[in-house]
Amino acid sequence: MIHIEHFTFNAFQTRCCVVWDDNGYCAFVDPGCSSPAETHEIVSLVESRDLKPVCIMLTHAHFDHIYGMAALAKEYEIPVYAHIGEMFTLETTNPAVCGAYGLPLPETFPMIKSISEASFNSRFYPVTGNDTIEVGDLRFEVIETPGHSRGGLCFFERTERILFSGDSLFAGAIGRTDHPGGDYDALISSILTKLLPLDDSPMPGSSSDSDMNPGSEASSGLSAKRHTSVKVFPGHGPCTDLATEGMTNPFLQPFNEPYDD
């Protein structure tokens, strides 16, 4: 079973999620804690729940999502999983935006290209859409969703029907694409072709309803979960679900589909 505690951190009201399984193995998703007091909230949760941190998962590396990354990675000696495309964000987007608004740059690490390059000071491990991140009994499928940033990712736990969408998809909105590395058409395409179809995807190890006794308790429980829309934890704002966004999000209606020439 999945357990999720989410926090709202820093001046940009960024959502950070701590997710763990029944055995206490946990991951930090987008740790935007920007002060010692905010970081202490995460540490206190880990201690009070007796959690065992496994990794940090970044949907993208914009400064407001990684302010607490270095402190937590060092505290628990854990890797940081992100897309290699976020090197552009770290080297170009963050300095440009933080410089324009007088914001501090977050501490970071160099990204390694292979496990053999790993060291204490190089904690970035690149992941792609072919990868799965294991956090105890939880399995997070990595979904590449470029558009808000070059290396944007979402993380999908298929059995629990939970999606961490970062700044790709919000309740009633999408992430902005006017920063360096942004691409509106790529973002819309990512959501329409990779995220919304997750609502119709099968659960792992499930049989079709016709293969089960329709009157059995197992059949009714599995069917109910399968037809529950995927819950979405965005990087900002309220949580939502894919069914609601597919029907009501104004950015995802047919007239907004990318132009194909």
Predicted segment positions?
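Conserved beta-strand hairpin/beta-sheet module of binuclear metal-dependent hydrolase folds
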Residues: M1-R49, C154-G166
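Conserved Rossmann-like nucleotide-binding pocket used by diverse enzymes
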Residues: E5, M57, E141
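Short Gly/Pro-enriched turn/cap motifs at secondary-structure boundaries
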Residues: F7-T8, S122-F124, E144-P146
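Conserved S/T- and glycine-rich ATP-binding loop of Class I adenylate-forming
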Residues: V19, T59, T145
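Metallo-beta-lactamase
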Residues: C33-S34, V97-A100, T132, L138-P258
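Active-site HxH/HxHxD metal-binding segment of metal-dependent hydrolases
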Residues: C33-T39, V43-E134, F251, F255
